From Swiss-Prot:
Any single GO BP term: vacuolar proton-transporting V-type ATPase complex assembly
Protein name, entry field: E3 ubiquitin ligase complex SCF subunit sconC
Gene Ontology MF term list: DNA replication origin binding; ubiquitin protein ligase activity
Record-linked Pfam families: Skp1 (PF01466), Skp1_POZ (PF03931)
Keyword Cell inner membrane: no
Family membership: Belongs to the SKP1 family.
Chain segments carrying region Interaction with the F-box domain of F-box proteins: 106-165
Purpose of the protein: Essential component of the SCF (SKP1-CUL1-F-box protein) E3 ubiquitin ligase complexes, which mediate the ubiquitination and subsequent proteasomal degradation of target proteins. Controls sulfur metabolite repression, probably by mediating the inactivation or degradation of the metR transcription factor.
Pathway(s) this gene product operates in, as recorded in its UniProt entry: Protein modification; protein ubiquitination
PANTHER family: SKP1 (PTHR11165)
Species, as recorded: Arthroderma otae (strain ATCC MYA-4605 / CBS 113480)
Length: 165
């Protein structure tokens, strides 16, 4: 068992780049962990068809930093609701990337089934939205407003009860 903890595996990104990493680091991904269990120690490279090299390297960087963390369980829901947007300092710095990379990391974390990374990415986006008006959110994420002024007024009236007063 100790030998597999330090053994290396190879991942192949969507753009064909092979990256060799420690098995323990790769197993932060439930998808990769399950693939390794299914393949055994065949030594074959594991294809990651939905993630390109630059994003995969960022995900691996996060996994290396968090390789010693306990695996997440379904029991942490109560704790995660309490601290909905708390992110530790290292993760905050890690997530200081351009928006495109941030969303690619979130998509990769979802695909690779790395719940803790997915949570950090989503909390980062939540913090970007927190306290902003719809107009500010549209500007932040370059979203075009497709409502007519009349539709906007109607939506505001229908949701007036939810406004902070």
């Amino acid at each position: 068992m100790a030998a597999t903890a330090t053994s290396k595996i190879t991942l192949t990104s969507s753009d064909g780049v092979e990256i060799t990493i420690e098995r323990q680091v790769a197993e932060r991904s439930i998808l990769i962990k399950n693939m390794l269990e299914d393949l055994g120690d065949s030594g074959e490279a594991i294809p990651i068809p939905n993630v390109n090299e630059s994003v995969l390297k960022k995900v691996i960087e996060w996994c290396k930093h968090h390789k010693g963390d306990p695996p997440s369980t379904g029991d942490d829901d109560v704790d995660s609701r309490r601290k909905t947007t708390d992110i530790d300092e290292w993760d905050q710095k890690f997530m200081q990337v351009d928006q495109e990379m941030l969303f690619e990391i979130i998509l990769a974390a979802n695909y690779l089934d790395i719940k803790a990374l997915l949570d950090v990415g989503c909390k980062t986006v939540a913090n970007m939205i927190k306290g902003k008006s719809p107009e500010e959110i549209r500007k932040t994420f370059n979203i075009q407003n497709d409502f007519t002024p009349e539709e906007e007024d109607q939506i505001r009236r229908e949701n007036e009860w939810a406004e902070d007063r």
